[in-house]
């Protein structure tokens, strides 16, 4: 099985370090995830080899492919059995619309902690699981994708109706 981890375009060294840590990789391996793809953006990793544009290694029984950026992460999201992500709104909505199991880790270093608010709201609605860097391994271990409530499909007619009502067309 495949796990895709993405930090987006903002540096999130702590999530990259956690994803490559022994506790997280061992937990993933024990749950049957043998492959991890890591989009690390501009994050800095201690191992110099990881700081190349892309590389592939094996660590703690998990095959790891890592790279900085691609024009689109759609293919990786579609292939993944589990997605672990920063809590950016664009990434969250893209993943939820695909119906993929999603664990989000808000980046606490960002201004006004807006990622935490979004992650918390969507977790309360049951659409994803939110966690911290410190609890990532235990969250993965206890995560039950079948308990996730599917995100409702986009319905553009609601917005159109609202505009029509406000404009007095209806």
Please report, for each region that a protein language model flagged, where it lies by residue.
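Donor-nucleotide binding loops and adjacent catalytic segments primarily
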Residues: 1-79
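Short acidic-hydrophobic, aromatic-tinged amphipathic segments that line or gate anion-handling sites
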Residues: 65-68, 128-139
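A donor-sugar binding/catalytic signature common to diverse glycosyltransferases
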Residues: 73-112
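CheY-like receiver
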Residues: 76-79, 138-143, 166
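Acidic/polar active-site rim loop that often engages polyanionic ligands
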Residues: 99-102, 121, 142-145
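Active-site-proximal loop->helix
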Residues: 107-130
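C-terminal amphipathic helix plus adjacent low-complexity
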Residues: 143-170
């Amino acid at each position: 099985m495949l796990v895709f981890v993405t930090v987006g375009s903002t540096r999130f060294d702590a999530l990259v370090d956690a994803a490559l840590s022994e506790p997280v990789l061992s937990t993933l391996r024990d749950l049957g995830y043998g492959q991890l793809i890591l989009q690390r953006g501009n994050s800095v990793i201690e191992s110099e080899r990881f700081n190349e544009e892309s590389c592939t290694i094996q660590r703690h029984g998990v095959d790891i492919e890592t790279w900085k950026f691609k024009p689109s992460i759609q293919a990786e999201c579609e292939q993944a059995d589990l997605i672990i992500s920063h809590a950016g709104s664009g990434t969250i909505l893209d993943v939820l619309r695909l119906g993929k199991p999603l664990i989000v880790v808000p980046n606490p270093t960002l201004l006004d902690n807006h990622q935490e608010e979004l992650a918390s709201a969507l977790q309360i609605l049951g659409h994803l699981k939110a966690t911290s860097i410190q609890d990532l391994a235990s969250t993965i271990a206890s995560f039950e994708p079948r308990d996730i409530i599917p995100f409702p499909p986009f319905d553009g007619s609601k917005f159109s109706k609202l505009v029509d009502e406000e404009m007095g067309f209806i």
